[in-house]
């Protein structure tokens, strides 16, 4: 009887909601409107490339449509660094877009922090190489960080701090791991949001 009452109540609410919506005036097209796109993930990648070029790196745009599991993207960027490290060229591999994280643990972090941490093992022992990833709005997940940074010394530093990269990733606790080794990127709110950008620097 209770189920029947609530079912009838829900249908009644739905009926009146639809009735009121259908009685509203249809929105009219606005006149004298100009729409301009003032920022995009492509422009974010272009700006990242310009910054890298100013530092003497040759930028390579991998994609501005990055959309996969964060740890897979990080592992891939780490492998790119490993492949090209020591080749005598200063290269900056850039990937823009937005990755995802499927939660398996109870830790703290965000997709950019997880991406960076996932690259740490591939970079282990390398000199003058790093991977970092940041959210353009200055916020990554439910944290105060914009993203994360790892280099050839990160994995050893994590081990010394009693942390294992793979166990940390399984617990989705990239924030505390990177915090322990100075790998968090903190920018504060930027006032914009055009996805994320990840950069792998190689020498």
Residue ranges of predicted features:
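Conserved mixed alpha/beta catalytic, RNA-binding, or beta-rich assembly cores of soluble enzyme
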Residues: 92, 96-126
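Short glycine/threonine-rich loop-to-helix capping motif typified by GTGT followed
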Residues: 70-80, 86, 101-115, 141-149
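Internal helix-turn-beta structural module
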Residues: 117-203
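Catalytic cores of large soluble enzymes that bind and process phosphate-bearing ligands
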Residues: 36-40, 44, 65, 69, ...
